[in-house]
């Protein structure tokens, strides 16, 4: 079973709201999922992610889609081996 981290659409017409979920790659976009990793509000541009869950699923071999990878890059720093490292805080 190949696991993907992808966006699951919610909201109403012209007001999308997404959940970042870990799901089987063979399941439809809005189908069953294994775990909710975070949320993404496109209107207000608010991204909320559970850091522990993100690292857990990436260490299990989950492959983020291109859009989720961009969201993760906004909040984290990718290393070469696709592991996530928290950014350093300013001193």
Curated annotation (Swiss-Prot):
Keywords (A to Z) from UniProt: Ribonucleoprotein, Ribosomal protein
Keyword flag Ribosomal protein: yes
Pfam families tied to this protein: Ribosomal_S16
One GO biological process term: translation
GO cellular component: cytoplasm; small ribosomal subunit
Listed GO MF terms: structural constituent of ribosome
Transmembrane segments: none
InterPro entries: Ribosomal_bS16 (IPR000307), Ribosomal_bS16_dom_sf (IPR023803)
PANTHER family to which the protein is assigned, alphabetical: 30S RIBOSOMAL PROTEIN S16, SMALL RIBOSOMAL SUBUNIT PROTEIN BS16M
Family according to the record: Belongs to the bacterial ribosomal protein bS16 family.
Record-linked NCBIfam families: S16
HAMAP family: Ribosomal_bS16
Name the record gives this protein: Small ribosomal subunit protein bS16
Organism encoding this protein: Phytoplasma australiense
